[in-house]
Amino acid sequence: MESRLLDILVCPVCKGRLEFQRAQAELVCNADRLAFPVRDGVPIMLEAEARSLDAEAPAQPS
């Protein structure tokens, strides 16, 4: 994921910062505990497509 794109993208729910998790191919919002998938290099920034991280440990920066 391009760092320039990461500088622009924000969580669609809270407008907070996102972290790219390379191993899971996801953009993670730690504030909302949501992980947005990245498919074929395209971030899917829809709340309905996000995976909840509530039951998991906090995401670690990659």
Curated annotation (Swiss-Prot):
<protein>
    <recommendedName>
        <fullName>UPF0434 protein BB2007</fullName>
    </recommendedName>
</protein>
<dbReference type="GO" id="GO:0005829">
    <property type="term" value="C:cytosol"/>
</dbReference>
<comment type="similarity">
    <text>Belongs to the UPF0434 family.</text>
</comment>
<dbReference type="InterPro" id="IPR005651">
    <property type="entry name" value="Trm112-like"/>
</dbReference>
<dbReference type="Pfam" id="PF03966">
    <property type="entry name" value="Trm112p"/>
</dbReference>
